[in-house]
Each structure stands twice: as structure tokens, then as C-alpha cells.
A protein has these predicted regions:
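Inter-Walker segment of RecA-like/P-loop motor cores
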Residues: 2-49
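Hydrophobic positions in the central parallel beta-sheet of the AAA+
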Residues: 51, 59, 79-80, 182
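Walker B catalytic acidic pair
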Residues: 54-55, 82-84
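Catalytic P-loop NTPase motifs of RecA-like helicase/translocase cores
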Residues: 31, 58-60, 87-88
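Short basic/glycine-enriched coil/helix segment immediately N-terminal to the Walker B
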Residues: 36-49, 59-60, 68-76
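Conserved helicase motor core of P-loop NTPases
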Residues: 84-193
């Protein structure tokens, strides 16, 4: 069985390759993009039995068209993988959402997160997206097995003082400043992010 792994962006294809231990390409590279067009097309099709396309929520209708023209549907099977909470295509159309909504294709929904199991931010984002309550109202709450996401409730008057205090604790604990992000509910004034 011959197969290829691809994703719409360089970063997504790198993550896919690192995670699987297999070579993964951008869809443009898979299709042999040049300024004159795509090397693989309806006349000269991809030679694979299977394609796995990750992060396909970012796949626009134009690139999807070129990808589908470059395969023989009698020979090649495609598995499109996406997280519906991820960003959509920045170009026209939302190919994957349209395919799902059409109900013309089999869809399997995965509900357990494996790759980020210990990540607090992913846990909070998932709980929030699924409507689960995650804040207990205790003032300071820490999330994740590796305690990498901290929620601190404070008054408007004490926000700057609290941020400085917590930031200093993180620096004193040896955490690289590049790994620290402070999120506030405003983007204006001296307290904005």
C-alpha cells in the first residue's frame, strides 16, 4: 500500500511528519506546484493508494479542487483529518465543512485528545468549547498535569501588581520568558495584551 501524508501549511506538515515519523509534505509540494501550475493534475495523477490530509479545515475550495483532480478515485482513497475548532481556510470556501454538512461522505468524530493530554490550555479550551464548567471561583486555579496554565482572578486595581508578582515567580522558577503568555480581557491601555 503506497501512501502520502500532507497538510495545507508547512507548519502543519512538519507537525504531522514529526508525530508520525513519516515524510509529510504541504499539499502544494505533494502536487508539485510550480508557477506554471501543478505537476500532478487530471492528466498526470498522483501514484498513491491512499492520501492522509491533516488540518483540512484550512483547505480552501481551490486547492481542494486541484487535489481531487490529481487522484484517480477508482485507485486512491483519501482520509481528511480536521479539528472543527481549528481555524478555517483564509481563502474562499470551507471544503471540509461543506463535505461534512453534505452527509455524502462517512464521518467519524474522535473525542479523546491524545497528543496534548497534560496541557492545561488545551484542557481549558476543550472544556470551554464543550460547555463544561472549569472555573471553581477560588481565585487562583492551575490546569494541566504539567501545571502550565494558570487562571488568576483579580480586581482591576490589582491586575498589574498581580501580573508582575506571578511573572517574577515564574522567572525565579527558571521558566524562560518566551514560554510565558499573559492574557487579559482588554487590548487597550497599559494592562492590555
Amino acid at each position: 500500500l503506497s501512501f502520502a501524508l500532507a497538510a495545507p501549511t508547512g507548519k502543519a506538515s512538519k507537525v504531522l511528519g514529526d508525530f508520525t515519523g513519516e515524510d509529510a509534505k504541504t499539499i502544494h509540494r505533494l502536487l508539485g506546484y510550480t508557477p506554471e501550475g501543478f505537476m500532478y493534475n487530471e492528466e498526470y495523477q498522483l501514484p498513491y493508494d491512499a492520501l492522509i490530509i491533516d488540518e483540512c479545515s484550512m483547505l480552501d475550495i481551490f486547492l481542494a479542487k486541484h487535489l481531487l483532480l490529481a487522484i484517480d478515485p477508482e485507485k486512491t482513497r483519501i482520509l481528511f483529518v480536521q479539528d472543527p475548532a481549528q481555524i478555517s481556510s483564509v481563502s474562499a470556501g470551507c471544503f471540509s465543512r461543506d463535505c461534512i454538512d453534505s452527509k455524502m461522505f462517512p464521518v467519524t468524530t474522535l473525542t479523546k485528545i491524545f497528543r496534548y493530554n497534560d496541557d492545561g490550555l488545551i484542557k481549558v479550551a476543550t472544556d470551554s468549547r464543550e460547555g463544561r464548567e472549569f472555573l471553581k471561583g477560588t481565585g487562583i486555579e492551575v490546569f494541566g498535569d504539567n501545571k502550565n496554565y494558570v487562571f488568576i482572578e483579580t480586581s482591576k486595581e490589582k491586575t498589574l501588581e498581580t501580573v508582575k508578582k506571578v511573572y517574577k515567580k515564574f522567572i525565579d522558577a527558571g521558566i524562560d520568558p518566551i514560554d510565558i503568555a499573559v492574557l487579559t480581557p482588554t487590548n487597550k491601555h497599559k494592562l492590555g495584551t
